[in-house]
Amino acid sequence: MIGLMDNSKLIDCITFFDNTTMFDLRFNILKNHVDLFVICESEYDHRNNKKKLNFETKFLNEKKVKYFVLNKPFPNETEIWKNQAIQREYLLENLKTIANKEDYIFFSDPDEIPNPQLLINFEIKKKFG
């Protein structure tokens, strides 16, 4: 809806580990340009060690934030990139309950913040990329 010419939503998806400051920055830069932030945090780090959840509760009351917790261990403690991919897949599964096929969804690392000016009235040339 924001920055788009139709009724579709722009959804920003990230995995979260422990950098609350980075998410705070991302949220404040993009909040006027993105319709929804979808975050997935795991109870395990990418080496499969149990960790505490670090996402700040102040964001849980934001209408624009959907937060999901992956609460099962990763199958392999040595394949950190595969474990991150599992976390993203879990995020994608949960997107099915909140996104529509008309929505535009982008995944990035939490520290890869898009330039918000590029999200204003942008034109999509292809749905997937």
Please state what every model-predicted region is:
Residues 2-32:
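N-proximal low-complexity "stem/linker" segments adjacent to membrane-targeting elements
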Residues 10, 30-43, 62-66:
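Short loop->beta transition adjacent to catalytic acidic/histidine clusters or analogous donor-positioning motifs
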Residues 12-17, 40-41, 107-110:
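Short His-Asn-centered micro-motif
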Residues 13, 93, 126-128:
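Catalytic phosphate/metal-binding cores of nucleic-acid and nucleotide-processing enzymes, i.e., regions
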Residues 38, 66-68, 106, 129:
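Hydrophobic/aromatic beta-strand patches that form the interior of the parallel beta-sheet core
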Residues 45-102:
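Active-site-proximal specificity loops/subdomain of glycosyltransferases
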Residues 101-113:
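Short beta-strand-to-loop acidic/aromatic patch adjacent to the donor-nucleotide binding site
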Residues 116-129:
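Conserved donor-nucleotide/metal-binding helix-loop-beta segment in metal-dependent transferases, i.e.
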